[in-house]
Structure formats: C-alpha cells, structure tokens
Amino acid sequence: MKILVYLEKSDVRGGIEIFAERHVARLRAEGHEVDVASDIRQEMGRYDEIVVHKCSDVSTLEKFPPEKTVYYVHDHEPICPRSYAYTPLKRNCTRPGGLWPCIFCAPLCRNWKPALNRVLSQGRRKRAMAGFRKLVVISEFMKGRLFANGIPAEKIEVKPPVIRAGETGAEDVTSGRKIDLLFAGQLIRGKGVQLLLAAMARMKTPRILDIVGTGNMEPKLRALAAQLGIADRVHFNGFQSNPQDWMRAAKCVVVPSFWQEPYGLVAAEAVALGRPVVAFAIGGLPEACGGKATLVPPGDIDALADALELS
C-alpha cells in the first residue's frame, strides 16, 4: 500500500514526533511504500491512505480526502483552543470545545491570537475530523474526550503505543551513582515537577531526585528546590538521549503530571522496564500504568509524599 504520512514542522522533537517516526518505520517494515511530508503539495490522489499525525491549521486539515484519511489524535489540541485542557485559572477542563465557553478562555492565553483563531474555527475542525475514515487515539480516556466533542464512537479506534523495553545501553549513565527517585520529561508546568519538589520537602525520609529533561520551568524549579531547602537532593541532568537507561537504574520513577495526560509514555515505559512507578491518577495515566503503579489523587501533595515514602 502507498501511504502518505503528514506531520507539520516543529522546532521540538517531542512525543508526537517520536511516535510518528516509529510509526513510519513500522509501516515500512510491514512492506508499505511510505512518503513523509510537512506540506500537502503532493498529489494525494496517488496514495491509498493518508495518515495525519499533527495538523494545527484547519484549512490544511480540510484538504485531506476524508475517505482515505486516518487522523491520529495525540493530545488535546484538536478539541481545546489552549491545547492543554486546563483553564487560565489553572484548573483542568472537561467541557467539550466550542464557541462557548472557549470564547472567554482564549483571550486570557499568553498566545491569545492563535487560541482565539482556534476557537472560531472549532466547528470546521470538528466537521473535518468527523468526516475522516478513522480517528486513532492512544487511550480510552481520549476516546471519551473525542466522543464528548461530537465524534461518532464507531469512528474512533483506541490503539495504545507499542512499548518495547530496549536492551541496556553500554554506558553507565550515572557514573556508578545509584538513582533513587527519577523524573523524566519536559520541565513545563503541566508535568508537575513543582508538586514533586513540594512532596519531597514534606517527606520524613530524605530522598534524592534525579531530573532528566529540559524546559522553560527549569530556572523556577531550581529556585523552588533552593527555597524548600532540598537543592542538595535534586540533580538536574538536562536532556538525555537514553532515558530508558536512567529508568532502569532508578529505584522509583515518578510521574507527577497534573494536566490530563492523553496517555503517559514515560509511565508505560517504566512499567515495561519493571520499575516501580508513582503517579497521579489523571487522564490516561491509569491506563498507561496498567494497574502496575501506585496512583494517588491528582494534585494531592501529601498523598504523593506518602506514596514516595513507601516506594
């Protein structure tokens, strides 16, 4: 089969980009002829199937032939103008996206113009999505979100990512130092590292935290660790190309996200590696953990501290 995979350009190689790369490799391994594009200048009529992994522009989305298109919905962006499914009041939002109430939320965004444009084009986006042959999500949680936004249930397929625990790398990632608690991910607000630091400060037993990843919250997190008096127990290791090796070496992997994670790839990988996981029970994280993690109420710092004491 001849397949076109569409993924819009991004300056960041995040989870969606990694997923798309793996998907392309898998399709080619299955014998399909696959082209990858970040524009649609190609003649789409010559393809048997169009796979869309990320498309923020609704005008572009409307150009894909509905009968051939399979749309992978990786996150909340297609149904939330703010993209993260929480309000400017820093609360998670479970309402369907639309002119109401999103028209009041979008102007309060930092990047309010794109958010407002997404509000005004929500109807067009939903109609385009509903017309596609199939929509693929990575959790039952996300299927429920799409259904609440008017997408017919029979068009939504739940396909969790295939997690393969790779072989241990030859490099000793910590130079012999054992890892106690590990956080691996972007240092952005929704990932909840600030809640993890607060929980560490409340624990009776001092623990060491290694952080793998970078992001715009790093300066604030360093300052918070110092303010809480735990800076000597928090190691910022920056971006690492081999996070699975760090997970293998960890006594416990912590996933303190307080936004509604569509799935939770880090949690799933840690479970696949046989590592203990402590996470907030929010969004798709319970599914990603598969009943093999300690889950605590979302945002409950005391409960997180108690769970880490026992990890």
Would you name each region that the model predicts?
Residues D75-V119:
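Acceptor-binding helix/loop patch of EC 2.4 sugar-transfer enzymes
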Residues V253-V255:
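A short hydrophobic beta-strand element within the catalytic core of glycosyltransferases
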Residues I18, I179, F183-R202, N216-R222, ...:
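A conserved mid-protein helix/loop that constitutes part of the nucleotide-sugar donor-binding site
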Residues G291-D302, E309-S311:
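Conserved acidic donor-binding segment of nucleotide-sugar-dependent glycosyltransferases
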Residues F104-T168:
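Donor nucleotide-sugar binding/catalytic pocket of nucleotide-sugar-dependent glycosyltransferases
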Residues P276-A279:
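Short hydrophobic beta-strand element within catalytic cores of glycosyltransferases
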Residues M217, A231-Q240, W246:
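Active-site donor-binding acidic/aromatic loop of nucleotide-activated sugar
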Residues Q244, P262, A267-A272, P286-E287:
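Short alpha-helical segment that forms part of, or immediately flanks, the ligand-binding pocket
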